[in-house]
Curated annotation (Swiss-Prot):
The lineage of its organism: Eukaryota, Metazoa, Chordata, Craniata, Vertebrata. The chain crosses the membrane at residues 16-36. This is Adipogenin. Plays a role in stimulating adipocyte differentiation and development. InterPro entries: Adipogenin.
């Protein structure tokens, strides 16, 4: 017996199978998007006060920043009496 007596996929069952096979994938994708949006909104609410970036070095020229770093390193090397 080469072929089944009743074919699984034909004109009548194709749309039914596509619907029931794609529905779980679509629902999982939808729930994943909702869950990620919830996590991202929760993270931004909790950590608003924790974020403290020092933008001053980025606003300076690289030469000024390097000179300032050299001054700080020289101050640290000097022993305090």
């Amino acid at each position: 017996m080469k072929y089944p007596l009743v074919p699984l996929v034909n004109e009548l069952t194709f749309s039914f199978l596509v619907f029931w096979l794609c529905l779980p994938v679509a629902l999982l994708l939808f729930l994943l998007i909702i869950w990620l949006r919830f996590l991202l909104s929760q993270d931004s609410e909790e950590n608003d006060s924790d974020v403290c970036l020092d933008w001053e070095p980025w606003s300076k020229n690289p030469d000024e920043f390097c000179q300032e770093e050299m001054l700080h390193s020289q101050e640290e090397e000097r022993p305090c009496c």
